[in-house]
Every structure is written in structure tokens, then in C-alpha cells.
Amino acid sequence: MNSDNNTKKETDERQKRNGSYGRNAGYNTRKQVNRSKNNKYRPQAKQNSRYQEKSAERYPEKNQDRQQKPVLKNSSRNSMNKNTGRNFQKQGRRGRRSSERLKIIPLGGLEQIGMNITAFEYGDSIVVVDCGLSFPEDDMLGIDLVIPDVTYLKDNISKVKGFVITHGHEDHIGALPYVLKDVNVPIYSTKLTLGLITNKLKEHNLVRSTKLKEVKHGQVINLGDFSIEFIKTNHSIQDASALAIYSPAGIVVHTGDFKVDYTPVFGDAIDLQRFAEIGRKGVLALMCDSTNAERPGFTMSERTVGKVFDNLFNEFHSSRIIIATFASNVDRVQQIINTAYRFGRKVAVEGRSMVNVISTASELGYLRIPENTLIEIDQVKDYPDDKVVLITTGSQGESMAALSRMAANIHKKITIKPNDTIIFSSNPIPGNEKAVSKVINELYMKGAKVIFQDAHVSGHACQEEIKLIYSLVRPK
């Protein structure tokens, strides 16, 4: 009997020490402790079943909510996106497995200039952003252009819902005629971009077999598990877009090629307000143009080039002026035409791609050409040198471009004269420096004046503009 009493006393004392008796019930001060960052010990509460039962009797609805409330691993799947009108909750009702993830698959364009193409995949849906080409390196003998490897798209063709194109530059649309032969799905983009794509498809007899869907800025399209919103941006071509890609896994913002230009030559400035609104919703990831990420400050406005042209036309008023630029830079062409008109010069256009772009932009209302300003290349010889401006391709030293053929004396209609002024209104794309230098040397040898500085501004954002977009979007 005495042994039983002693055992009971020892047990009671041990319970007191361990904190599971009397006033200290519910706390274990010896074992259940958390060490915080400042090295202080803090006791952790242990649930008391007696108090829990009383709480359940007094507040049955509160206890029921606590027990039945689900844990959402992906809250965006069960939310309504007000701007897109898309209810992602429907996808959860289809029995979508929690193991599914958003896949971002770059098929080109990373750590290189050109060949931009990225696939976004979720579940049974793939959306492809851009489909560009790049130009061959010096050691790629016999190669005219380089297109991306789309084997992954061909292997998953049943999932591919469409191409979404940010703007109409070759490094974003140039591979479409080749890729569409194996991956023929609809193409979604803005008006001018689709016009330029149509020109390329005509050359390959693919217009009838391709579905082209025009989208306006601010509009949202639904492609499988994705909803994609087009956002107005500025670039060295009009109708450029950024994309807000809504998926059950979250929002991805794809800037496309962009700059922040508050005084664009044509159209509105970049829609920074919309970037901020999307940022407040919560953005999973930001895919940003980084071409000029190593350049500090801001990119200058395209309008500043117009003033440079005015000064150059005034300085070289007595000579024939030939300007080489990118064919797709419609704003640059517009400023050249404006300056030529003010100085009483006629404008001739040379280079197949240049002629196609100017014709398309003019027909769609993106280029305003004063009456009786344009002349044919055959008519150049009928005008004095100080009354003519020639806009040509070849700013990148392409061997078969118009300016390169003029420099090599193999152009059929234009011969370089000692008094000519040649303006390079572009910067060499990395890798093209040698070819451009060769053309410049050949022009100098013929006695022409060559201007290759100060007549160009980039269409890509510098560091401060990238920081601005990042601060607005605030990706996770």
C-alpha cells in the first residue's frame, strides 16, 4: 500500500515538472520549445482537449469552418480574373491534377540576338509567343538564315493553340512561313504586325491555309487554359505589344521588345498604368527585354532622330542623300519622308523588303506620305542630286542588300558618286560589325561621305526603363 502511494506521489511530481498538471496543463516547458532568430526560447502551446470540447459546444459553426476549410495550393485556379472574364474555377472542376505546372520553354532568343520564340504550356494547352529567325554566323557557309528547332511543338501538335506575336520584326516573325508548314495553327497579333506577316506568307503561298486573327491593345483572347491580354508598348515599329499571360498557375508578363517613349512619332505612349494594374493583381513572373540591360539611363525618344535628319539635310544640302535603315522601322521612314518634304526633296525607295513594308504601312494607315513625294527608283536620274533622297536596305551589311550592291558597283540602277552622302540610320546588330565596316570602307573608297553616328536611337529599353517596369509589375 505504501509503495502504491509513493508511486502516485512520484508520478504527480513528475507531471508538475513536465507542465502537464494543474495550472501548467497544456504547456510542456522542457520539450516543446521553439528557438527564434534572436536565440530566445518561447513555449509552444499544446492543444487542450477539454477546452477544445467546450469551444466546439459554444461555437459549433466556427469549429466546423476550421475543420472543413480546404488548403489551396494554387489560389489563382479558383479565382475569377475580372479583366479577362475568365473563371479558372471551371478548370478545377474538371479534376485537374495538382501535379500540373506551368512550363515556360524557350525555343530560341535567349542569350542571343534574334530567333525569338517561347512556348508556354499548362495541361493540354501550349501557346507560342513569337516565331523569329536569326542571321548566320561567319562560319555558317552557305546558310542564308537560321530558324528555331520546333521539334517539341511538332511532337505536341495537338496541344498547340496558336502563335501570339508581339511585333513585326524579322527576329519575331521571320520563321513563321517555315514553321507553319509543320505547325499550322492560328496567328494572333495587331493590325500592322498581321499585315507584315501576310506579306511573308504570300511569298510562300501560305495565306489561304493560315488563320490570321487581329487583336487590339487591351483585348483578351482565350487559348485553351490560357487567357492573353495585349498591352500597348513602344518600340522601333508601331503596334508593338506586351502580353499578360493568365494561367491557372498565375500571371506571366512578357514585355516583348519595348522602350518607354512618352513622345512617339505615331500613336500613344506605352500603357504604364495597365502594367501597374496587373502588378497589383500579383504576377508570378516577368519576362523582360534585356537587349540594352547593360546601358545606364533611358533610351532617347524616336522624335530626336527627326531633328538629326533636319540638321544633316541642312548641312549636306547640295548632295544626293542615301539613307540606310531597317525596313521595318516605319517611324524612322516617316521622319525621313517628313524631313525630305520640308526640304523639297523627292523620295525613292530601294530594296524589296523596304518597298513591301512601306506599301503595307501606307495602305493600313500607319505611314503618311505627302502627295507627289514618292518617285520610282528609275526616276532618280531625272532629278538633280539636291532634290532626291533614297531610302534603302542594307544597314546591316547584308551582301545582297541594295546598299551593299551599290557599294560593290553591281547595282543596276544606282551608282555611288563622289558627292553622295550616305547616312546609316541604325546600329550594327552584334555579329554584323565586320560586314557593316566592309560596306562603309567601300563607300569611302568611292569618295562618298558616310555618316554612321547620331542618326539612330535604339528601340530597346535601357536600365532605368527596365527598373520602372519591374517596379510596376513586381513579379514573385
Predicted region positions:
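Generic long, charged, amphipathic alpha-helical segments
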Residues: L443-L468
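His/Asp/Glu-rich metal-coordinating catalytic cores
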Residues: K90-V164, H169-D382, L403-T415, K434-S437
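Redox- and metal-dependent alpha/beta enzyme cores, enriched for Fe-S-associated oxidoreductases
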Residues: K412, I416, S426-G447
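Intrinsically disordered, low-complexity RNA-associated tracts
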Residues: M1-S98
